[in-house]
Curated annotation (Swiss-Prot):
GO terms for cellular component: host cell Golgi membrane; membrane. It comes from Murine coronavirus (strain JHM). The gene is E. GO terms for biological process: disruption of cellular anatomical structure in another organism; viral budding from Golgi membrane. Residues 38-79 are intravirion. Residues 1-16 are virion surface. Keywords: Apoptosis, Host Golgi apparatus, Host membrane, Membrane, Transmembrane, Transmembrane helix. This is Envelope small membrane protein.
Amino acid sequence: MFNLFLTDTVWYVGQIIFIVAVCLMVTIIVVAFLASIKRCIQLCGLCNTLLLSPSIYLYNRSKQLYKYYNEEVRPPPLEVDDNIIQTL
């Protein structure tokens, strides 16, 4: 009939455990790699949110304030009398 020894059975079980362990390790490594890529993408988005967007906002706002100051707040330049300049 069947001539299965205990050592053969242990060897087969050991092979199955080894294959399952290798598959688990590969799965863990792949998941860790994908998670690190996800973190990198999140950090790039965070960099955009914390650095780039406020800089663009400050640039546009300061440009608006500069135009407003030059057009409405700043007093007109004083006219200089030519006689005063000639006497100097």
